[in-house]
């Protein structure tokens, strides 16, 4: 724990000593590309696709959204269309529909251009398998013997969220937890999300006795204690996602910020083709849901 506070102090000192002068780097400009953020899952709901145009790094204007596109997914037999949302420019939504696990889906996007041509984009993603159920969720401070996870920060207890479930034997499956508190989505951006590759623990009962014996627990989220109240409802949507999504996620996170020289060593990966016309990702997932009610185990009776 000492190393945790030492790192905090060092970061603070570096912040005080850092230069505040703006440095503007002259970057080569290119033609706008089409940004695609589309998802499809086994949940019975309206699935979304968001289409926009890229802009220069220093652009301060509103992002230009794509209008009038034709968007659909198909498994080769059935086709599901995303219809343009007239109240949200650039958003396209399906009718309520559920995808099927272990099924390959192809996303197709046709974007009309001002000269009458059409830009045709496509992507494929296998909607992966998922666990059958989450047996329970426990919210508690981390109690491992090592310092890999803090239990206290800024004089407040950290409450970690631990799901208990039988994981799939496939080590390439990645789990992404989506967290709600009292029906309010908390992980609504990628920077607030976690990706959990279980790796060598694939096939284990997650957070069960075998993992405890190895002093290994896997939390999926945390709360500062002051942000939790007795009887708060905490819901976990555990998404199983394709393994190639993890490279997109990490390069995207590395590329955030205001300095073009501090980021990923190459362009953010995309599974949208042709790659010289588009950026972004077509994201498939299967989802299993569980909910718990927070009880303060240290509350005085």
Predicted regions and their residues:
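C-terminal motif of bacterial Sec signal peptides marking the signal peptidase cleavage site
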Residues: 15-18
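A sequence/structural signal for flexible, mid-protein segments enriched
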Residues: 20-301
């Amino acid at each position: 724990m000492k190393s945790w506070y030492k790192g905090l102090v060092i970061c603070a000192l570096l912040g005080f000593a850092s230069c505040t002068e703006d440095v503007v780097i002259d970057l080569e400009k290119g033609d706008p590309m089409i940004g695609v953020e589309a998802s499809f899952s086994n949940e019975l709901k309206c699935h979304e696709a968001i289409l926009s145009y890229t802009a220069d790094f220093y652009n301060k204007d509103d992002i230009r959204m794509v209008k009038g596109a034709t968007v659909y997914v198909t498994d080769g037999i059935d086709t599901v269309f995303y219809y343009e949302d007239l109240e949200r420019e650039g958003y396209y939504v399906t009718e309520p529909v559920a995808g099927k696990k272990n099924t390959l889906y192809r996303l197709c996007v046709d974007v009309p251009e001002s000269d009458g041509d059409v830009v045709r984009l496509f992507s494929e993603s296998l909607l992966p398998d998922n666990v059958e159920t989450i047996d329970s969720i426990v919210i508690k401070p981390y109690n491992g013997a090592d310092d890999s996870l803090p239990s206290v920060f800024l004089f407040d207890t950290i409450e970690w969220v631990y799901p208990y479930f039988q994981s799939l034997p496939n080590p390439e499956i990645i789990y992404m937890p989506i967290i709600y508190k009292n029906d309010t989505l908390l992980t609504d951006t990628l920077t607030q999300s976690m990706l959990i590759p279980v790796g060598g623990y694939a096939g284990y009962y997650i957070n069960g006795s075998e993992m405890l014996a190895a002093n290994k627990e896997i939390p999926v989220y945390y709360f500062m204690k002051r942000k939790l109240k007795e009887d708060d409802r905490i819901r976990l949507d555990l998404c199983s996602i394709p393994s190639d999504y993890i490279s997109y996620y990490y390069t995207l996170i590395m590329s955030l910020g205001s300095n073009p020289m501090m980021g990923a060593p190459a362009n953010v990966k995309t599974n949208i083709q042709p790659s010289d016309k588009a950026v972004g990702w077509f994201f498939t997932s299967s989802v299993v849901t569980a909910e718990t009610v927070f009880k303060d185990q240290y509350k005085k009776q």
